[in-house]
């Protein structure tokens, strides 16, 4: 396996995260061409964990509105520590550089927290440089 590390900064300043883990490169045909890269890791997010319920008793209308807005506009990860499975389809350009289409999922997996298990899915393009 190979070690990976990544940081994701949210431009709306909501749920940023950093992750580390392991991945395995599976060549599709001859080495130096296309490959799959499945991986698993752990992430830490600064996103919300444990949002308060909007239907709690004795709330002011303003507090109920605030909690309702949070419910519909923020992800409640349930935990700051999350699983980070990922999958990439890549092409090795040369010995040091690859380009990948990637999919990453963040979730507590009902292991780090019981109850709500909202997650975050992230798809994109990566430029990979091997040291």
Language-model-detected regions and their locations in the chain:
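Transmembrane beta-strand segments of Gram-negative outer membrane beta-barrel proteins
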Residues: 1-7
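Outer-membrane beta-barrel transmembrane domain signature
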Residues: 10-131
